[in-house]
Amino acid sequence: MARLLLVCLGGALGSGARYLTSAWALRAFGPDFPRGTLLVNVSGSFLLAGIMTASLQSEAVPPDLRLFLAAGVMGGFTTYSSFNYETLALVEQGRLAAAAAYLLATVVGCLVAAFAATLLVRWLAG
């Protein structure tokens, strides 16, 4: 039960952070492209890869903290369902180039971010 509570608390924090990040992106860039979701998914991929790499390479991140951060915070922060919905909305609006750019930027951006975080954590760990 305690581990479930850790995931739930982390999820609440991650969801709140996602809302704030998306709201900021909407104010900063406008509604023409889903930059907020792109930002949370790419940065979330970077952070999750960093958390997992650090926790699996050493005991510096205890299992309960890893659960709180990875499944909880990052699970609440990133959003695959919004990515899919926003891609479909762009297609339905006839904005095929924007949909393709969003799809490519998300998939490639998330993979590059995860790879970069993994390399960074391994480099920092020596």
Swiss-Prot record:
Compartment(s): Cell inner membrane
The keyword Transferase is annotated on this UniProt entry: no
Membrane topology: Multi-pass membrane protein
InterPro entries: FluC
Regulation (activators, inhibitors): Na(+) is not transported, but it plays an essential structural role and its presence is essential for fluoride channel function.
Record-level Gene Ontology MF annotations: fluoride channel activity; metal ion binding
TM helices/strands, residue ranges: 4-24, 36-56, 67-85, 101-121
UniProt KW keywords: Cell inner membrane, Cell membrane, Ion channel, Ion transport, Membrane, Metal-binding, Sodium, Transmembrane, Transmembrane helix, Transport
Highest taxon of source: Bacteria
Catalysed reaction equations from the record: fluoride(in) = fluoride(out)
Gene Ontology CC terms: plasma membrane
GO BP term, example: cellular detoxification of fluoride
Binding site for Na(+): 75, 78
Family of this protein: Belongs to the fluoride channel Fluc/FEX (TC 1.A.43) family.
Main function: Fluoride-specific ion channel. Important for reducing fluoride concentration in the cell, thus reducing its toxicity.
Protein name (database record): Fluoride-specific ion channel FluC
Species of the source: Anaeromyxobacter sp. (strain K)
Upper classification of the organism: Bacteria, Pseudomonadati, Myxococcota, Myxococcia, Myxococcales
